[in-house]
């Protein structure tokens, strides 16, 4: 399975950074245009391991429902979510937060994913999806730095 890793530093304390990422409505502010995402529901709320989120995700008129489960959550340290149904066959996203220099925070992401189908075509689609994710993280890092200045 392909893996995308990303790491960025923001000039904000870890409790503030975790609180920002712990609020699923903030995900929309981290998506590069023209992608759009909107939270439809959380059950149960507030977010905790086992919570299921439904989002509406897409580009322009091409939209679909994306259902995600929160697998693990350690306040001010980490959380893990995985896709139950949506644009990928597998999407397992680990978010880790570590204290950084000058009171800032390191944000580390690891995404294990598979778009499908299997075989050569799937490998090509996964490679393209990996590239899109890497570019998304580049945009997201710049956005995080602006939103989380501490």
Residue ranges and their predicted role:
Residues 3-5, 63-67, 89-93:
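Short, surface-exposed coil-to-beta transition loops
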Residues 10-12, 59-61, 72, 87, ...:
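Beta-strand elements of well-folded, non-transmembrane domains
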Residues 7-11, 56, 69, 96-98, ...:
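Generic structural detector for well-ordered beta-strands
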Residues 39-85, 106, 139-142, 147-150:
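Glycine-rich portal/gate segments that line the openings of hydrophobic small-molecule binding cavities
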Residues 1, 92-95, 137-144:
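Secondary-structure boundary/capping motif
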Residues 1-48:
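Hydrophobic ligand-binding cavity/cleft-lining segments
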Residues 80-135:
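Beta-strand/loop substructures that line and gate deep hydrophobic ligand-binding cavities in soluble
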């Amino acid at each position: 399975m392909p893996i995308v890793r990303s790491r960025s530093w923001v000039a904000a304390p870890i409790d503030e950074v975790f609180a920002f990422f712990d609020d699923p409505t903030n995900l929309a502010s981290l998506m590069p245009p023209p992608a759009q995402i909107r939270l439809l529901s959380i059950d149960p709320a507030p977010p905790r391991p086992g919570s299921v989120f439904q989002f509406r995700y897409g580009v322009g008129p091409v939209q679909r429902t994306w259902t995600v489960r929160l697998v693990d959550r350690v306040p001010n340290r980490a959380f893990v979510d995985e896709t139950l149904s949506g644009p990928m066959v597998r999407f397992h996203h680990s978010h880790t937060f570590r204290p950084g220099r000058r009171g800032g925070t390191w944000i580390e992401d690891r995404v294990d994913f598979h778009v499908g189908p299997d075989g050569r075509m799937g490998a090509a689609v996964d490679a393209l999806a990996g590239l899109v994710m890497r570019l998304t993280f580049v945009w997201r890092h710049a956005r995080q730095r602006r939103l989380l200045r501490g």
